[in-house]
């Protein structure tokens, strides 16, 4: 696995600089995403009268976990937005902190991962905004983020996603993406997406940004999501509390690199990866369709640092579906009040989308496995919110009938409090290597990666994962040079 290629293409770079001038585009640095205090005051002033989802280049500066929880006019805050799951809900004594992606543009943190993939090629000129189309293969949210960033950066985009994804995804994409391609199947049908990208690759104007293989994805999550989770923990921890673990379900596995950063800062913690029980690829070399939208794609992503992963946790998709209804129906919210939750806490539970709920369930199983106490904290992220799944709640109501307080109590007990430590595995060295070796069949046999790079991921951490994570500084230098050539910062 080589580092991100930052070779300059002078012709493409000149075209991109001119495009940026014409469209008033200033590109934020990774450092500014980590610490919004570094953002110029004139840009912040413009944000005070810009909506969170507005198609305005200034919203590139809202690719941050530190946004205020406002639909319009929001600036930044020291502590990232998060949902804490009380013990009365989780059934475990430890603290579970889930950092919210709802307050990114598009309502999902994938706008960050897609930036991490596009920005290096844009500021080097490898991607020419006047010639190339940005192709975003995805199981839903990544192509939304990629299409949004493409629009802000004045690039043409092609979104590819499975036809069975939620209606809300397609409705929104129709307003943003230049072209939408729906591939056969559901969440776990990524092979069909890859096949479509190979077809599109025959056209030299189509540039593929494959989140499962692009090292810009883990670079962004390590340097932005990882730092934000550390900020969150440090800002809300109580005396004597320790960070015991982080749990992330794997779609592209980009967020697992946030865990790499956390393990460096908190050496005693453990990092767990989650997947759907109906598609147990990591746990059991398994396969199958499932309903946890955004994760679990019947392969091991190229960008997953498996060697640094301590545990795999499988979540039944029925649990996340039932809890989505509990948290988003009036009857379920009334039930949550009986557990002592405030109106503010209940509102925050709507910040959890389906994969976010699965992440929280991973944290609960993790806590039960390690018998965590009040002194322990487990962190995760909420990729998106329930906004993307209102149609799914309606489908559940049609499937199971009208909701009630009794059904809510039953769902809570069966699908959260009743979680066991089954279908999970603390990974030994040989077991991690077994998972890592699965990459061969997708990436070497099918997608053109080399055995040498595959082995380097396992045996040479310093020149692979560590080297990619460290490229943020070099990328920022290129972004600053690009902005200087565009000249808009000086004119602020």
Predicted regions located by residue number:
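PLP-dependent amino-acid enzyme catalytic core
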Residues: 1-492
